[in-house]
Amino acid sequence: MKKLFSAKLFSALVLSFSLFSTAHAASPKDELNKRLSMNGGFSADFSQQVISPEGETVMEGEGTVEIARPSLFRWSTTSPDENLLVSDGKTLWYYSPFIEQVSIYWQEQATEQTPFVLLTRNRASDWDNYKISQKGDQFTLIPTAVDSTQGQFQINIDAKGVVKGFNVVEQDGQKGLFTFNNVKLGKPKADRFTFTIPNGVEVDDQRN
């Protein structure tokens, strides 16, 4: 009788602990927020692949990325074409030397077109616009807005807050896969997040 009672008590305790743990486990949104908050910034090299809906590699590229949270970033593509994306937290510049043009946006405008911005500011209200799931170190974000033109955005970030890369899955099935290498933690210098418009280039100011 004592053995039966002990077995029942043990089972009840295990069940209670299991329910307690589940109730207090961090949600994917909270876990993502926590991991992104661990480091104030980083710099890295990146490699990029664009995969067609049919599974073919249609483009490969590489470059460098620098981030200082909140909201500062410098994204420099060196191949296949040279271009530069810089944000000072308020204004975003996109410079294409090949066509000699600079496009200027408010950073708030760019989130829909460039979900990468989500990585840089880690703003709690942003995550409310997504259904977030977690599988290991990969977090998948799906927009909740019915009229959103975004597909899925996947962030690969480990338990120490080191971002390993991210993926953009378009609604038509095309994928952009970005992998970070040679990651160096720490905020880059502030002057890395300023941009001076070169002389003679065309300026397309979309802030108005």
From Swiss-Prot:
GO cellular component: outer membrane-bounded periplasmic space
SUPFAM superfamilies registered for this protein in UniProt: Prokaryotic lipoproteins and lipoprotein localization factors
Location in the cell: Periplasm
Biological processes annotated in GO: lipoprotein localization to outer membrane; lipoprotein transport
Signal peptide (from-to): 1-25
Keyword terms of this UniProt record: Chaperone, Periplasm, Protein transport, Signal, Transport
Superkingdom of origin organism: Bacteria
Pfam families given in the database record: LolA
Family: Belongs to the LolA family.
Quaternary context: Monomer.
Function, as annotated: Participates in the translocation of lipoproteins from the inner membrane to the outer membrane. Only forms a complex with a lipoprotein if the residue after the N-terminal Cys is not an aspartate (The Asp acts as a targeting signal to indicate that the lipoprotein should stay in the inner membrane).
Name under which the protein is recorded: Outer-membrane lipoprotein carrier protein
Organism: Vibrio campbellii (strain ATCC BAA-1116)
